[in-house]
Amino acid sequence: MKNSTSIAIGGFDGMHIGHQHLFSALGERGTIVAIETGYANLTPKRERENFTHYPIMYIELEAIRHLSGEEFIAFLKEKFPKLQKIVVGYDFQFGKNRKHAVEDLKTLFDGEVKVIDKVTFEGESVHSNKIRTKLQLGDIKGANAYLGHNYTIKGEHISGQGIGTTELVATINLQTDGFLVPKEGVYVTLTRIDDEEHYHPSVSFIGHRVTTDGSFAVETHVLDGEVICKERASISFVRFIRDNKKFETLSELKEAIKKDIAVASKELQFLQL
């Protein structure tokens, strides 16, 4: 990273299509500078690295929020001695109390400043907050369009209720700390098990088990045969099927799950996984 001549600065949670426009302006010797605010839940921790070939430097906001505009530029030059170009979004702000905007950056930095205009999809500007809202509303297709990829959560394999295999269908239960989970309900998904390179067609449930014990669950049922999950799995969301619903009996729930499986199977039948 010390040899980088260009950097893109931002939060970059989600690594959505707007972010990718910034990265396309970096050139060959570029680095992404991700400012960690503590709010990243679309691509938490180091998940952003899965959506770019550029190296990423993570900087905690608390470490720089007290810096003046001049001090911030000096900080960047210390981190990147060969810095020639800074790429930012049109709404970028920096310095103590977010005092400075892109015009100040052009004044304070003696190299090139590339400002990327807002990126839109179907007339709407793309922002991470809008993606979060879409996920919370169950608008998976809308969120994925803004992201430029399927929204994906990851987690450690945990024990479930134990009634899936015997009374309903076998599921893999996950503890997905750090990720924003979509609206409660049932989804067409793709599931990746442990270190496998491919995804399995699946149907997944997010929410409280209102028909049984009321506990919250993130669980996925793989459609192409029985699989064994040893440690972890990823769930990639394709589309919303239905809301979470309380059924009077387990047999009613099982019938609903059969219908969910049929919907997911039809949706995913033409995908090359």
Residue map of PLM features:
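Phosphate/ribose-recognition catalytic cores of enzymes acting on nucleotide-derived substrates
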Residues: 160-273
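A structural signal for isolated positions on well-ordered beta-strands in alpha/beta enzyme cores
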Residues: 31, 85-87, 114, 221, ...
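A conserved beta-strand->alpha-helix junction
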Residues: 55-64, 117
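Classical nucleotidyltransferase
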Residues: 67-171, 194, 248, 252
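Short glycine/proline-enriched coil/turn segments at helix->beta-strand junctions
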Residues: 2-5, 25-30, 52-56, 81-82, ...
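Glycine-rich loop at the start of a catalytic domain that most often binds anionic cofactors/ligands
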Residues: 42-50, 71
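N-terminal catalytic cores of NTP/NDP-binding nucleotidyl/phosphoryl-transfer enzymes
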Residues: 1-45
